[in-house]
């Protein structure tokens, strides 16, 4: 079941939430819409669902004009961040609700509904909670029940709006793996919205990075992480060191000094050098492109994070690097830093 969005524009007063957005979701794909608040990701999801209407543009589902139909006619399963379970209904009745309110001509028999709900509760591994009420469930259990309810009507597509946003970090991580494995079983064309970069990279087949109502990049998790298409994507996904540089005559300058780094075909002028924290090799003073002094060191897990004062930037500017614990960095150490991978983007 393919989804295609072409030239979608949506404005709220003077604010343009979506600016000529084009997107195609392939049959059976699990796609993430990733971006900060206000990037347009939830608005795009709601337009696909039929909960919002664009000012202009085209939305098709399996080749049909979706904008000619309301939300109910699009046969979409929708999962909200805050579950939206009916508190007065037990788990079984919540999952069965969508089946029981279908038009009579397509409604299943009570025996079929019972079997369908039982199968779904087994699928989400919560059959033993069929008689419980929402207030008797954990947050993770409620979200799985909400997903089972969305799947009950056998939707053509499944849309999830920040599905794990209300859960604590440990439960979120568990449910990411669970959702990815579940999708491998059901193969329903699915789109989920998130602002969590790790979540998008871990769960999705493809990631759509959005900012200010536009799509910055579409690609596999590996593509958007390893080959970011813009300064925004590099800065938003992962943790980066960002340095103000200038490209001049094919060389990269930081302050008054030429760096021994290629300009990567960047245009001449003010630019920004992006380096991921873990892509910097730490060595003795004089061994790298940059020189600095260790200002502070903090341990976390197998790594240590150090605040470094670079010679080129002055004492008021710190950068952070990640290094293995066995480097035994100490406050006051003079060190050399060598970027292993980096990107240069024009400073707009």
UniProtKB/Swiss-Prot annotation:
Keyword Lyase set for record: no
GO-annotated molecular function: ABC-type sulfate transporter activity; ABC-type thiosulfate transporter activity; ATP binding; ATP hydrolysis activity
Primary localisation category: membrane
Ribosomal protein in keyword set: no
Pfam families the record matches: ABC_tran (PF00005), TOBE_3 (PF12857)
EC number: 7.3.2.3
Alphabetized SUPFAM superfamilies for the sequence: MOP-like, P-loop containing nucleoside triphosphate hydrolases
Binding site residues for ATP: 35-42
Membrane topology classification: Peripheral membrane protein
Residues in ABC transporter domain copies: 3-237
Compartment(s) of residence: Cell inner membrane
PANTHER family with a match to the protein in the record: SPERMIDINE/PUTRESCINE IMPORT ATP-BINDING PROTEIN POTA, SPERMIDINE_PUTRESCINE IMPORT ATP-BINDING PROTEIN POTA
Complex formation: The complex is composed of two ATP-binding proteins (CysA), two transmembrane proteins (CysT and CysW) and a solute-binding protein (CysP).
NCBIfam families: 3a0106s01
Function according to Swiss-Prot or TrEMBL: Part of the ABC transporter complex CysAWTP involved in sulfate/thiosulfate import. Responsible for energy coupling to the transport system.
Protein name in the entry: Sulfate/thiosulfate import ATP-binding protein CysA
Gene source species: Rhodopseudomonas palustris (strain ATCC BAA-98 / CGA009)
Gene behind this protein: cysA
């Amino acid at each position: 079941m393919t989804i295609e969005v072409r030239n979608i524009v949506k404005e709220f007063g003077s604010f343009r939430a979506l600016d000529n957005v084009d997107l195609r979701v392939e049959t059976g794909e699990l796609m993430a819409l990733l971006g900060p608040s206000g990037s347009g990701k939830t608005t795009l999801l709601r337009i696909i669902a039929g909960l919002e209407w664009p000012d202009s543009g085209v939305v098709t589902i399996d080749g049909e004009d979706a904008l000619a139909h309301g939300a109910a006619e699009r046969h979409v399963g929708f999962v909200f961040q805050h579950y939206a379970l009916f508190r007065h209904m037990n788990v079984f009745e919540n999952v069965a609700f969508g089946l029981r309110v279908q038009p009579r001509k397509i409604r299943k028999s009570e025996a079929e509904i019972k079997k369908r709900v039982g199968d779904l509760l087994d699928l989400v591994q919560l059959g033993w909670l069929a008689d419980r009420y929402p207030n008797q469930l954990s947050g993770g259990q409620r979200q799985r029940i909400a997903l089972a309810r969305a799947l009950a009507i056998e939707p053509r597509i499944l849309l999830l709006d920040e599905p794990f946003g209300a859960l604590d970090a440990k439960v979120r991580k568990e449910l990411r793996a669970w959702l990815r494995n579940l999708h491998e079983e059901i193969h329903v064309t699915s789109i989920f919205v998130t602002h969590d970069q790790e979540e998008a990279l871990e769960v999705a087949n493809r990631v759509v990075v959005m900012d200010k109502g536009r799509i910055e990049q579409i690609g596999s998790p590996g593509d958007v992480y390893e080959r970011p298409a813009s300064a925004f994507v590099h800065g938003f996904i992962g943790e980066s060191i960002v340095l103000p540089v200038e490209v001049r005559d094919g060389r990269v300058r930081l302050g008054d000094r030429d760096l021994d780094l290629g300009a990567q075909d960047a245009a001449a002028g003010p630019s920004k050098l992006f380096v991921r924290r873990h892509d910097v090799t730490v060595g003795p003073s004089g061994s790298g492109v940059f020189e600095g002094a260790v200002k502070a060191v903090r341990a976390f897990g197998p790594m240590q994070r150090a605040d470094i004062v670079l010679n080129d930037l002055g004492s008021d500017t710190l950068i952070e690097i990640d290094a293995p614990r066995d480097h035994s960095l100490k406050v006051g150490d003079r060190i050399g830093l060598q970027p292993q991978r980096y990107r240069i983007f024009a400073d707009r």
